[in-house]
Amino acid sequence: MNNIKSISLVFPLYKDKNTVEVMIFKSLQILKKIKKKFEIIIVDDGCPEGSGKIAQRYAKKNQKIKVFFHAKNIGYGAAIKTGIKKSKYECIFLIDGDNEYNVNDLPRMLKALKNNDLVITYRYKNKNNI
C-alpha cells in the first residue's frame, strides 16, 4: 500500500469525557506532521455524559473533524461500522477514544503499510511492564 495520500482516523466514543479532548489534540498534532490529507471521524455511541458534545465543539472550529451520533448506545462494533461508513479517505485507522492506544504510533503504522495491506497493533506488557 505504497504512496498513501489520505487518512481517516476513526474514534468510537462511549463514556470518554475525560480523554476525548486529549485524543483530538494529539491526533491533530500527529496528523499535521504526517503531511497527508486527513479527517478525524468521531462516533458518539449514545454517550450519557456528553463526550460527543465536547468533540462537537472542536468540530465547529476545525472542518477536518466530523462528529456523528448514535441516538442510543448500540455497541462498540456499531460505532466502528458507522465511522468506517462515514470515512472518505483511502486509509482508515481505528483508535479508541479512551486514550488506551498511543496515537503517536500512527507514523510507525503508516511505515508498516508500505509493505503490507493491513496493519494491526495492540498493547503488549512484558515481564518488565513495558
Name each region found by the language model.
Residues 36-47, 68-70:
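Short beta-strand/loop segment that forms part of the nucleotide-sugar
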